[in-house]
């Protein structure tokens, strides 16, 4: 049954959807909505904004796309379990951290790493980028990577170090990592929206955003702008999740923290983004510095895994369990 649905999706084009004429189809394609699945997981407002049609008409187009794609209906637990067999897991380079995450980072999910400056967030993103290009027998996907760099922290020299430690060709590894610098929050959102264009040309199985909240935090200051910030952040995260769902890709993001002034006992640090990030991220890892290059990684949120923590090592060779 699942195979026939997949074949049905491939045969249908967006022109087959009722209400999608030549002009509307062109506008949809220009904005990344060039297949049935992309439209099926969109919102009426998104389609209305890019095509100029009313939200009511957009809702009908989406409903038809969902029918073609066979999504949006109730499923049995058995059917969901069968569908989840398509999910793959990407190694972090540390068996300890992989075990904490139930085998690695899941595709079709957002995994958030948050912590203070120097806690290892960007190092882990570099390691994930290298690992994604590795063959499957080494825990990779043998696939390309996209990275949205918001703080100018991507370093090809670090990729070379990590690739060499994995026995991979550094030049070939660098060729498979596609980096875009985001200069503000709107540019960041646009890059995520356009990620599908790159995914059509390359086999992208990992999308990294480092850092998710830096631009939003600096541009939307004060309570007066909080609602707008959260609305944009919500849209951005759902764009990322949609990409992961459509391309069966891992979404890995980093996040900053701030101290809560109302906390007098325990750890006062909390991730930026509030409930929007908290509810949309599938897995949340809190990173803390320890001694001798070690980091403590704590899983604080997951749909099915228990809370727990482990120790990882970050060295010149990359992320590992250490000794």
Curated annotation (Swiss-Prot):
Alphabetic keyword roster: ATP-binding, DNA damage, DNA recombination, DNA-binding, Nucleotide-binding
Any one of the GO BP annotations: DNA recombination
Compositional bias segments (type: Basic and acidic residues): 1-15
Location of region: Disordered: 1-21
SMART domains, alphabetized: AAA, HhH1
Top-rank taxon: Archaea
Family the entry assigns: Belongs to the eukaryotic RecA-like protein family.
Name used for this protein in its record: DNA repair and recombination protein RadA
Organism of origin: Thermoplasma acidophilum (strain ATCC 25905 / DSM 1728 / JCM 9062 / NBRC 15155 / AMRC-C165)
